[in-house]
A protein has these predicted regions:
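Short beta-strand-loop/turn "lid" adjacent to the catalytic site in phosphate-handling enzymes
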Residues: 70, 76-122, 143, 150-160
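Phosphate-binding/catalytic loop of phosphoryl-transfer enzymes
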Residues: 123-124, 130-169
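Conserved active-site "lid/cap" helical segment
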Residues: 37-85, 115, 129
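Extreme N-terminal starter segment of soluble prokaryotic enzymes
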Residues: 1-4
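Conserved active-site and cofactor/substrate-binding residues in soluble primary-metabolism enzymes
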Residues: 57-61, 65, 103, 107, ...
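Short, well-ordered coil/turn elements that cap or connect secondary structure elements
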Residues: 21, 26, 81, 137-139
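Short glycine-rich, Thr/Ser-proximal phosphate-binding strand/loop in the N-terminal lobe
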Residues: 12-56
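A short acidic Gly-Thr/Ser loop motif
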Residues: 6-11
Length: 169
């Protein structure tokens, strides 16, 4: 099983392709400066770093470039995109909606967007990445993993006590 894990920031997209059978990283990288003319991809495979200067106006274009590199005939990490069995998305803020990882649905996307006010530099970019993956890998399960999920498992008094109650309301 091969899993693509992505972390979309406001102007970057970090990723790893992990082979779960032998717990190895097949490729990893970081697409930097998304939305700027000087955007570029740092792609590492087999210990060698490749730098690809490519204009990516948005996360979808960046993801397409990453997929091109994963399939690069000179140094392929994958034989085809069908080799990807699942995609994991790191999400900074899930609000009170999520206390564990969940499969992506339209409702999940809406709730991540709703929580964008708490993490505007990350959640909105993450939604772009999710939508791009759904479009480019339509039959692959997409899973979201929330940084805030741990806090949903705390006793209510533990997360309310340190702040004035009206902030919680």
């Amino acid at each position: 099983m091969k899993v693509l894990v992505i972390n979309c920031g406001s102007s970057s997209l970090k990723y790893q392709v992990i082979d779960m059978e032998n717990n190895s990283v097949l490729a990893k990288g970081n697409f930097k400066r998304i939305g700027e003319k000087e955007s570029f991809l740092e792609h590492k495979i087999n210990g060698k770093m490749y730098v690809i200067n490519e204009y990516a106006p948005n996360h979808e274009v960046a993801l397409k470039c990453i997929f091109d590199e994963l399939l690069n005939k000179e140094h392929p990490a994958l034989n085809s995109l069908q080799d990807i069995n699942a995609v994991g998305h790191r999400i900074v803020h899930g609000g009170e909606y999520f206390n564990s990882s969940v499969l992506v649905t339209e409702d999940v996307i809406k709730k991540i967007t709703d929580c964008g006010k708490f993490a505007p530099l990350h959640n909105y970019a993450a939604v772009q990445g999710i939508k791009a993956c759904i479009e480019l890998l339509p039959n692959v399960p997409q899973v979201t993993v929330f940084d805030t999920a741990f806090h949903q498992t705390m006793p209510k008094e533990s997360f309310i006590y340190p702040i004035p109650y009206e902030y919680y309301e």
